[in-house]
Amino acid sequence: MSKTVVRKNESLEDALRRFKRSVSKSGTIQEVRKREFYEKPSVKRKKKSEAARKRKFK
């Protein structure tokens, strides 16, 4: 979980920007989107295979 403490003489916008940056670096949003709905193992394998194929031919 990301935590951001507002520093002395720091605006709320700056603190929010630091919080958003730390959340995006930790990958929290992507993880939530990935786990939003159940994905069957066969579908996971298929997506993984397609991603590898896409990387290979890029």
From Swiss-Prot:
Record's InterPro entries? Ribosomal_bS21, Ribosomal_bS21_CS, Ribosomal_bS21_sf
Example of a GO MF term: structural constituent of ribosome
GO process terms (BP) = translation
Q: List the disulfide bonds.
A: none
- Keyword field: Ribonucleoprotein, Ribosomal protein
Q: Which GO terms describe its cellular component?
A: ribonucleoprotein complex; ribosome
Signal sequence bounds = none
Family label = Belongs to the bacterial ribosomal protein bS21 family.
What protein name applies here?
Small ribosomal subunit protein bS21
